[in-house]
């Protein structure tokens, strides 16, 4: 389900403050965030965010194609180790 247009995109308030401070300082440090539900805005382009996936902060550098998506889309929370092999194929 898509968010209503009149509401606008959701962005955590602290995230905006951290991004503005990083832009003002000109430093390219990783900005640690826990808000996976926040929407990526055009003013975040060029910054690097450390998005928390439940274990660690995954570095995500923002480009123009990511605008409008959520931070959580770029930080997977589950690891897939593959299915077990076919036992019939091993015997033959």
Curated annotation (Swiss-Prot):
SUPFAM superfamilies from the UniProt entry: Ribosomal protein S19
Organism: Rhodopseudomonas palustris (strain BisA53)
This protein's GO CC annotations: cytoplasm; small ribosomal subunit
Entry's family note: Belongs to the universal ribosomal protein uS19 family.
Summary of the function given for this chain in its UniProt record: Protein S19 forms a complex with S13 that binds strongly to the 16S ribosomal RNA.
Domain of life per record: Bacteria
GO biological process assignments: ribosomal small subunit assembly; translation
Secretion signal span: none
Keyword set, alphabetical order: Ribonucleoprotein, Ribosomal protein, RNA-binding, rRNA-binding
PROSITE patterns reported in the protein's UniProt record: RIBOSOMAL_S19
Single GO MF annotation: structural constituent of ribosome
InterPro entries, alphabetized: Ribosomal_uS19 (IPR002222), Ribosomal_uS19_bac-type (IPR005732), Ribosomal_uS19_CS (IPR020934), Ribosomal_uS19_SF (IPR023575)
Name of this protein: Small ribosomal subunit protein uS19
């Amino acid at each position: 389900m898509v968010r209503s247009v009149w509401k606008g995109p959701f962005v955590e308030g602290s995230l905006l403050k951290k991004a503005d401070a990083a832009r003002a300082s000109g430093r390219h440090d990783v900005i640690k965030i826990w808000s996976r539900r926040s929407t990526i805005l055009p003013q975040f382009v060029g910054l690097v965010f450390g998005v928390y996936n439940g274990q660690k902060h995954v570095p995500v550098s923002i480009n123009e194609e990511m605008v409008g998506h959520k931070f959580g889309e770029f930080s997977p929370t589950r690891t897939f180790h593959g299915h077990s092999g076919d036992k019939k194929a091993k015997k033959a």
